[in-house]
């Protein structure tokens, strides 16, 4: 077959071609040659910074007194020469890769977060919003660098803020079932042990998770197929450290080795990240487990665990604790929250609720340690176009990709199919390591296959699968699990015919997904076609390939034009929806849609909507978003705002415009604003007042009375959004206050996990950042008894204000505005229901107003359970209570309510109806 030529057209400057030259000289068990040590060991006379380059000194001339245990382990000069050659090859790879990188810098998205001091590569794709930083490189860039991944492009998995560590202050404690517990300094780890240096491929257990999420949403975020990277790691063998501390035998109960990091995380009510491995793994020299302090010839970077982390070759990344602080030898496995609630593959029928209620997390058999076998097609890359002409059809096309397996098992075969698995072609493999002396292979390999272009033209899809030396291979179909982990089904690339230029045809290749919340990929398109009732069943033969023409395609520039109440379009998971006719029916009000009209709001839609809402969305689908480079308008990240709910706006509402504000207003309906926690006060055992500083001290929040804001935060790697109404006045400058009831886990039987956002807020330390978006809501109080509801005016002289629990906050906001205006004479009659007297929020303020403004403020409390001496009502809101404490129905009376849906549905609405209120016209529900 003729030699392959690089003649395919790429919309991006880099292709999926592996460019690293072949090298078959690596062995993964090579110690640092002749016992290298630092020429100037880090000490108190100098600060060692992350990413610092290391100068090596040959200690071969030193006498072997055993103090550093740096014995020459080489048996022959030829082996020593091989190891020196491979180190030279690594250094050249690293040097070349670094020379091709753009400079790292502090990302503006990190400003105001705990990570604002960290420089990062701008090309990294963020998967969990602003914070914490979880990211992967573009797949084409990852493959461009080949065998060794430059550190700035290595995938990152962080559960929280990165510790700002100092070398000279850092220690690693070894304790538990050891005879000599020791706390090692970094200098001791570097100088008192023989170090090892070898390449290892790290893979997140969530690699390719987005494919699972497109099938059914898991509890994890959207990793693409680039959560895999390879570096040269240098560190101290774990077994040597444990032996130095006198690790006890298995007979004495030393069965597990636990690792604990330094970061403070919200999981489990607040904990460090921790996990464990079995003792036999930790002490097995063939496992090559090290405490690593160097990556690609430099000190670890902050995101990768500076100053020291675990490297456990062949295992998932989740076992390799970063920012290592403690090693504990125990009888039982780690009891850390993240050891049990992360990195498990549960049976497909187990969802999050069942996993919690039936304790599936704690079943030993579902833990993940070793990686499974996996492979990915990287060339053709996503949206690559192969022109079909006389020249290209005379030459083969070279397909490429990567493959890996776990436990040191070598990948022995990679196969490609273009007919759905009926036939397979064997690929050429490129292993750039020669295996350890124990026969272990810790790194990925690359595969390639030359195919005829005409065969591609007739193919429906291309699939790949790998085999390892244990004859493990990849399953044909995806196997869903609640954490979306270890996805290794065949990787499939779809093909379609396109017209890249006038008078030309070509093949456009489509990968299954795109990472994070980026739209694109055949899975999103096919998912919506499957559940759509419209359109004929798609059929295709090899002789008539075609692009999908049954679903109308829209560019992002077209979607952006539809951002008003007259035409409100949104994008969710690559599909375009016309939400205009739903504006008046949206439970959250039209603003919830209008703040997102004309944008891609995938992330926030998923964060606040149920599966039922997602099914309802299908009624409004009008087509797909064009994402291919040959037909779509170019769009920058700034052109897509991931924010807010899904629908928004009434036909009668004016469009959201970016008018110049009369005052310096913080809120922007199109943009999330970062707000810093500057004060936290405990008002009771479960009530907090949070004060958040605005981005500028001279700003007001800009929230109209009656409307609310969304608080947005990443909790356990998922976007969480909740609506809150500030308790501070609308004209306060520089900050806003929230009074929040914290719903702790294991307190309310119906909600054993408690409130996600309230517990997260309670866990925040001063200086933490949350994102705020708004305003939104369908009710606005304009003053002097005037409201607008869905854009329509309403007026009242008397207000019946009925609230329950935290639903008092919008009621409180309206009361605050009325009482602040001396010309506003509106009467307010408040009935406020709670479980107990202790649960009453803002009682001091309410009682003060009732006493100070007796002629127009009446407050009545209702609790389910009361202590002796309680002078208000007990039980639930009834018709009698309302008749006694709110105004009788009249043309100048409106009822306002906010609280739990059952209270509104079964107490407020029926009892007001009995009193003669027109529920549709006279009851305003926040």
Swiss-Prot record:
The keyword Metal-binding applies. It catalyses: nitrite + NAD(+) + H2O = nitrate + NADH + H(+). Residues 1-85 are annotated as: Disordered. Heme binds at residues 586, 609. Pfam families: Cyt-b5, FAD_binding_6, Mo-co_dimer, NAD_binding_1, Oxidored_molyb. Mo-molybdopterin binds at residue 204. FAD binds at residues 722-725, 739-744, 751, 756-758, 809. Its EC number is 1.7.1.1. It comes from the Eukaryota. Binds 1 FAD per subunit. Binds 1 heme group per subunit. Residues 670-782 form the FAD-binding FR-type domain. Residues 58-73 have a biased composition (Low complexity). GO terms for molecular function: FAD binding; heme binding; molybdenum ion binding; molybdopterin cofactor binding; nitrate reductase (NADH) activity; nitrate reductase (NADPH) activity; sulfite oxidase activity. This is Nitrate reductase [NADH]. The gene is NIA.
